[in-house]
UniProtKB/Swiss-Prot annotation:
GO biological process: cellular response to oxidative stress; mitochondrion organization; positive regulation of mitochondrial ATP synthesis coupled electron transport; positive regulation of transcription by RNA polymerase II; regulation of cellular response to hypoxia; regulation of generation of precursor metabolites and energy
GO molecular function: DNA-binding transcription factor binding; sequence-specific DNA binding
Location(s), subcellular: Nucleus; Mitochondrion; Mitochondrion intermembrane space
Species per Swiss-Prot/TrEMBL record: Homo sapiens
Stated induction or repression of this protein's expression: Up-regulated by hypoxia (4% oxygen) (at protein level).
GO CC aspect terms: mitochondrial intermembrane space; mitochondrion; nucleus
Keyword Oxidoreductase among UniProt keywords: no
This protein's name: Coiled-coil-helix-coiled-coil-helix domain-containing protein 2
Disulfide linkage: C114-C144, C124-C134
Location of the motif Cx9C motif 2: 134-144
Family matches, as InterPro entries: CHCH (IPR010625), CHCHD2/10-like (IPR055304)
Amino acid sequence: MPRGSRSRTSRMAPPASRAPQMRAAPRPAPVAQPPAAAPPSAVGSSAAAPRQPGLMAQMATTAAGVAVGSAVGHTLGHAITGGFSGGSNAEPARPDITYQEPQGTQPAQQQQPCLYEIKQFLECAQNQGDIKLCEGFNEVLKQCRLANGLA
């Protein structure tokens, strides 16, 4: 076994002699480098990805969107067509009539067919200082009399 002891001593000596050399020349501190980005693995990405909603959740979300859109659409439609003015039980609005003939005029016109034209001519003659300005009304009155056989 002397052989093993020799080798042991000889082996131990060289490392001891090397140690002082290393201490004499200290190494500079290593510069910190950012770690290289590891490519994403298939196992890690599935755990980090958010969970997607199921089919029923998507259908419920779509139905809610349709309901809101329908409500907004109906409200705007009623606003445009006058739904805010009183609801569906209210009477429909009557159009404004700009001209209505008096009810008593019809029998009077049957008795005197050119009464309206006469009134127009007389009103013009009273309001105008010059009768020549009322020639148009006079001409209409003459045409009415000819058409009704009164001339």
